[in-house]
Amino acid sequence: MEGGGERDHEAEPEYHCHDFEWEDLRADVEANPSFSHHLSPFPTTAASPSPSSEAWRSFHRRHASGRFFKERRYLLKEFPDLLNNNDVAKMLEVGCGNGSTVVPILRCSRNNIVYACDCSKDTLEKANEIVNNTEGLDGKDRFHPFLLDVSKETFPDWLFCKSCQMSNAKAVDLLLDSSEHNTRKEHPVLLKENQCCVGGIDAVTMRCVSVLKPGGLVLFRDYGLYDMTMLRFSPSQRVGFREYMRADGTFSYFFTLDTMRELFHAAGLLELELEYCCVRSINRKNGKSMQRVWVHGKFQKPTR
């Protein structure tokens, strides 16, 4: 595996996931009166702003001049499946940003091919620039970015493999149009209080599953309940149950294991791994300890 430039001298990335117990953090949060606004049900009659893709486009335009996000090289240790050295592996990243995930995936194996979508044209151009200009990467013909807002649009036909092009596409259309889906959207089991993220995340999940070949994997990592960033939000920033709006208009949702289990099981996937990743890090400027929480999940599409 070829490197380039200063990368030969970079420290080996570390991966931590059990620095503390999530249940201990939960007990501390729920016993702290200052966090009570995070725990109370969100009133269903409250008028909340609707999430806008334009907020993310503006975010990426503001950070287009530099590498706002560092390479997420730790993902190769969190998900060893990405370390593919034998067969050609085609991957899809939904919401690729500026390529901070794509670069280490392409670098770790010349057999990896990555398709990546985002709702921002500016950030796709930046990601393509970074991939093409990263020394020793040779990812020009292995990186295929395309513009798509997955919260509103279905994937293009050319992305579907032969084994799933007909059956999965039809299955998703039937699900999205069915009375069962309409009932779920109105009365979801675990998402009843929040409508999760931008609302309709169950439809987004099904769209992702629709382009996954039988036996393929969904690798998931996102904010987990009681992450440090969640606890910093004020009551006025709360726009839903476990959902908050930042000052720039972008939204953050904090997942639970039950939420993810329900979403992917409803989409027909098998649960292989699902846990909270609990990481304690130290702020080098002020020396304060930070407790970070992510949900780590790996799900597989059945072969039959």
Language model feature labels by segment:
Residues P49-R62, G66-K70:
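S-adenosyl-L-methionine
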Residues M1-S50:
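N-terminal auxiliary segments of SAM/dcSAM-dependent transferases
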Residues A89-K185:
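Class I SAM-dependent methyltransferase SAM/SAH-binding core
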Residues G224-N286:
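C-terminal alpha-helical "lid/dimerization" subdomain adjacent to the S-adenosyl-L-methionine
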Residues G66-K90, S100, P104:
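Conserved alpha-helix/loop element of class I SAM-dependent methyltransferases that forms part
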